[in-house]
């Protein structure tokens, strides 16, 4: 099995609600789905409001909040829904669909091998005066081994807002039963991994400046002070474990979403304006990022010969821990707010 970065705790408790209806009508946005279906501990961190079968695929709805302590903590004006909010909504919809439609048992954990995000209409993400009503049309392919044993699921989702196709997201996962996952982690480390809820919430070092990484709330800063050498910028990944949007439940590793946030923040430290939106993101996770060992992110121009990081541009961010590459993320940015069409 591929070693990966993110694991979301399985929801072994049966869902008391009946299976969602078929997609003969548009998804509804009146209540959230059972939080256990999307592997969230807090109801207020659930964005999916509806999930229906749609032929061989599925159709979901998600309500995007106008204000959120993490996803809404950005200086871009006019305000826009963040690409990581779209990714989290897609993750939740795919997780629930996996359990309901694609044979993933409730005691199974998803391990994210990689994902891709492409924003196809940046204007569609501009926030209005009401919460966004995101429609997610998705499909999935099961990866099976001998005897039909499930090894993983690959999801592909198209996301639309107000009738405009806004983004396309692909998520590649492996799967493991809960006990198999615990055995895997022990064998890899030769020890039981620590968990986030037991970690000291005191900052490991001096954090990066919040404004410099596009944040107002210091709790949302996930990097330490940067180091610049040649054409590269590096910084330690040091998230705040008490941030309940990033760590909704207890983890035994640094989750993928935190690494992608670290990559974006490092891009801003490398010179990308904090009001420049992410237009595309691809990520690959090759190892678990352990909690009890330092990890460093390094940003370089994604394409040889690229000049200063002035959007539109691309940056490659590499994560290293104990001398090995554990993850890679490539981010593309569009023009900063106020520079569109310039």
Task: Show where each model-derived region lies.
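Extended intrinsically disordered, low-complexity coil regions enriched in Ser, Thr, Gly, Ala
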Residues: 81, 85, 95, 99-111, ...
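Non-catalytic linker/capping segments at the edges of enzyme domains
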Residues: 1-78, 174-246, 342
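Acidic/His-leaning functional-site neighborhoods
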Residues: 218-287, 291-296, 316
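A structural detector for beta-sheet-dominated domains
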Residues: 63-65, 118-120, 137, 174, ...
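HotDog/MaoC-like acyl-thioester-processing domains
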Residues: 2-25, 135-203, 302-342
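Hydrophobic beta-strand-centered segment that forms part of the acyl-chain substrate-binding groove
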Residues: 96-140, 264-302
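Hot-dog-fold acyl-thioester-processing enzymes
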Residues: 3, 55-109, 233-269
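A general secondary-structure signal for short beta-strands and their flanking turns/coil
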Residues: 55-57, 129-133, 150-154, 166, ...
């Amino acid at each position: 099995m591929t070693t990966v970065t993110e694991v979301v705790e399985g929801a072994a408790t049966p869902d008391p609600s009946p299976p969602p209806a078929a997609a003969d009508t548009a998804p509804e946005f009146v209540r959230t789905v059972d939080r256990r279906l999307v592997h969230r501990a807090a109801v207020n961190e659930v964005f999916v409001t509806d999930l229906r079968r749609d032929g061989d695929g599925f159709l979901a709805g998600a309500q995007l909040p106008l204000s959120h302590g993490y996803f809404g903590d950005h200086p871009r004006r006019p305000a826009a829904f963040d690409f990581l909010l779209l990714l989290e909504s897609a993750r939740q919809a795919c997780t629930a669909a996996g359990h309901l439609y694609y044979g993933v048992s409730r005691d199974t954990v998803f391990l994210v091998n990689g994902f891709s995000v492409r924003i196809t209409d940046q204007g569609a993400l501009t926030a209005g005066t009401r919460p966004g009503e995101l429609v997610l049309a998705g499909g999935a392919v099961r990866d099976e081994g001998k005897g039909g044993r499930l090894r993983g699921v690959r999801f592909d989702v198209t996301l639309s807002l107000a009738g405009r196709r806004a983004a396309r997201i692909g998520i590649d996962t492996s799967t493991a039963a809960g006990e198999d996952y615990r055995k895997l982690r022990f064998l890899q480390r030769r020890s039981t991994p620590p968990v986030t809820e037991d970690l000291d919430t005191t900052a490991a070092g001096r954090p990066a400046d919040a404004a410099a990484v596009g944040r107002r709330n210091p709790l949302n800063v996930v990097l330490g002070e940067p180091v610049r050498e040649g054409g590269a910028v590096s910084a330690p990944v040091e998230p705040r474990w008490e941030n309940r949007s990033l760590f909704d439940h207890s983890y035994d590793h640094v989750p993928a979403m935190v690494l992608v946030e670290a990559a974006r923040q490092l891009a801003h430290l490398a010179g990308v304006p904090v009001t420049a939106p992410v237009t595309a993101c691809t990520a690959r996770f090759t190892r678990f990022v352990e909690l009890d060992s330092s990890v460093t992110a390094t940003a370089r121009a994604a394409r040889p010969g690229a000049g200063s990081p002035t959007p539109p541009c691309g940056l490659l961010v590499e994560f290293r821990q104990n001398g090995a590459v554990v993850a890679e993320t490539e981010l593309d940015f569009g023009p900063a707010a106020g520079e569109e069409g310039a």
